[in-house]
Amino acid sequence: ALPISVKTNEPKSRNYFIKGAYHTVNPTANNYVSVYKENAREFTMMKTEHFGDAVQMEVGALMVGRIVNHHEEGIMHRGMEKGYFEFGGSTIVLLFRGDKVEIDECLLERTKDGCETKLKQGQRLGMAKKQSLQS
């Protein structure tokens, strides 16, 4: 499901695929292989209500047959299913401009400690910075 709200009547881009391997995606493996650079990836660019331009990137992983995205260009809304991973799970990376988002402190601290954090769909990860909400 799409984790952020896109601007009304602003279409997301088509899906872009980047060929790559299917290494396991976990903190230990990332010490040996740069999975976010080497694994198969698919991404979409969009304009969001509170964060400005953003990218959602799905990262393929070991035991993931492929990435399936339903929509090409078009209007999306928060909570809509954008696609899924066939067989198994993987990782989704959200990219924002640094001045637009404030990540929750508990996630930053766990990251500094090298800990993986399991998250649930819909769980808050951060919020738009105040100046971002006003622009």
Residue ranges and their predicted role:
Residues A1-S135:
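Contiguous, well-folded functional domains in the mature portion of proteins
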